[in-house]
Amino acid sequence: MGKLTLLLLALLVWLQYSLWFGKNGLHDYTRVNDDVTAQQATNAKLKARNDQLFAEIDDLNGGQEAIEERARNELSMTRPGETFYRLVPDASKRNQASGQQQNNR
């Protein structure tokens, strides 16, 4: 009976070792679980970005206001008879701002 008990004990030790440290063990499970969590976070960010892009596409397809807004902001277009003004800061303020940026580096 002693040999059978020793054999069963050795089998139990081997099974426990393979469960904890072997291939597809708990270490691999926690690593894969962390990878899945990171991928889900990335997917959520990409889904939010895609939803925003689809909303912008729907807005551009549906109305003239969005097209006009993009033309004004990105291409600096104006309507006939309208004057476009661009406000530029003073040269002294620009020099001061660039000096502060260089000091921050």
UniProtKB/Swiss-Prot annotation:
Residues that span the membrane, as ranges: 4-21
Chain ranges sitting on the Cytoplasmic side read: 1-3
Where would you find this protein in the cell? Cell inner membrane
What cystine pairs are annotated?
none
Where is this protein primarily located? membrane
- Membrane topology according to the record: Single-pass type II membrane protein
- Biological processes per GO annotation: FtsZ-dependent cytokinesis
Keyword Nucleotide-binding among UniProt keywords: no
Family assignment from sequence similarity: Belongs to the FtsB family.
Q: What is the documented function of this protein? A: Essential cell division protein. May link together the upstream cell division proteins, which are predominantly cytoplasmic, with the downstream cell division proteins, which are predominantly periplasmic.
* Protein name per the record: Cell division protein FtsB
Instruction: Supply the source organism for this entry.
Output: Klebsiella pneumoniae subsp. pneumoniae (strain ATCC 700721 / MGH 78578)
User: Which gene is annotated as encoding this protein in its UniProt record?
Assistant: ftsB
